[in-house]
Amino acid sequence: MTSTQSSQEVLADHDTVGGDNTSNKAKSTNIFLRLIQYHYRVTKYEKSEEQVLRESKLLPCIPFNRWFLIPAAVIIQFCCGSLYAWSVFNQPIDVLIYGEVVNMAPITFYIAVGSFGLSRNGPMVSCLLGTTLFVVGNYITALALYLRLIWLVFVGYGITSGVGLGICYISPVSALQKWFPDKRGMASGLAVCGFGAGSIIFAKVQLPLYNNVGLPLTFVVLGSVYLVLMVLSGLVLRTPPPNFSVGSDQTENGKVVEAHANGDPPDKISLIDALTSNNYRFMYAMLLANSIFGLVVISRLANMTKEIFGKTPDEGATVVSINGLFNLGGRLCFSILSDYIGRKNCFIIMLTSQLIILGSFSTITTTQTYWAFLMTMFIISSCYGAGFGVIPAFLSDTFGATNIGSAHGLILTAWSLAGVCGGLTFTAVFNAYRDGAHPSDPHPYNINVWWIFGVVFLGWIALLFVTPTAKDRAFTRRPRSFFRSIINRITNRERSFEMN
């Protein structure tokens, strides 16, 4: 390829990647599987020398460095993190449109989450497309609030912005997994911790902004801020050049070649084999279970602090901000921790913690123990955020970094399912038990907890069947080796004593 040729996107050859068995499976007559295979097909980019040279510079006078991607990814995720602060708008939107609180606004949050997991066409172009949709969705929401049309709010924020959020969420994560094959856990954690940071800041900014300019103009101002920040950050995103390497980890044409230094590399399998494997199914159930309670809590946390515990709206917004800090901390700390103790072990900690909290939730709310409520909610938020920090590295370790973009995008539909089905179910049950009840009565929340407990328990069972990664196996061997060494020392001393 000469330097004058343009960059071409070429469909990866599944036959050569997966072997004869993969080829036969890829050519399945199952129409649904073939549609998935086409929609989430593996692609590679063959870059011209001209493009490689151009992308080697961030600016004409500044050479590009892979670490520039970290702040760009954090800023993009930071803007997307405003989704987590949506609960601040629940009551103002209901009052503006209906004149009273009718619990319709939270549904927009669930629809927005349900739009995640869509396909992309490369980090920079995808991010700019997602930004356009996200910003336009905010402007449509402003128009909907001006006209007082709740269905247009659903279309604007729930669908249009939701699709844009989904595209912008995955683009930097996929790029960082390719640029940082030596630090997958850290890279995925840094990429998504901006989401938590966004919820902290926007939860505090949105309420004063609404009080000063009104609800419709709030979305106009926010949309304009998103436009500037996300476009500038999106222009930084790119894929690695051909044969990019870091230590013993190498990429070819932007595709990562696994290194034995990071553990046993996964077999070279096609994307369709990865998506239809038992491991992927169990991981899907695992992520859904880890997401469902966190989604419900985040969208109603401000309401619970005000209704059950009688706190002020300002304190409710503060709690949402602090909750976002724990969300951020969970994403970053667990993802880094997973580089040492393993991805599966981290998910075992997350789901077990949630089961314990769900079992004690009714007691905490009934007795109105505020400090215990805050502690459990912050732990739930940490575990919820941690799932999104660990899952990209978990997928890379299990199925290979070549498949990470599409595998990550599709598995986020588990989050969508938890948001839509779980959120709407929660709302239906909540409204049914809320009729005639006092606003401070926690029973509508408590009754919902038990079906969520069942979902999380099933996800915990599914997690047990997920194949552990090399890091998981190495970590579980350490305690055995430690105790074995102690036993050997004691045995050797006894033998030495007997000989003497």
Give the label of every model feature segment:
Residues 113-123, 331-343, 430:
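Helix-to-loop junctions at the C-terminal end of transmembrane segments
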Residues 2-80, 263-281:
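Cytosolic juxtamembrane N-terminal segment immediately preceding the first transmembrane helix
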Residues 93, 165-180, 187-188, 301, ...:
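Intracellular juxtamembrane helix-capping segments at the cytosolic ends
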Residues 132-146, 353-366:
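C-terminal ends and interior cores of transmembrane alpha-helices
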Residues 195-244:
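Helix-loop-helix hairpin linking two adjacent transmembrane segments in secondary transporters
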Residues 86-93, 272-334, 388, 419-426:
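Extracytoplasmic gate region of multi-pass secondary transporters
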Residues 283, 293, 308-394:
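C-terminal transmembrane helical hairpin of 12-TM major facilitator-type secondary transporters
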Residues 137, 150-167, 288, 371-386:
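Hydrophobic core of transmembrane alpha-helices in multi-pass small-molecule transporters
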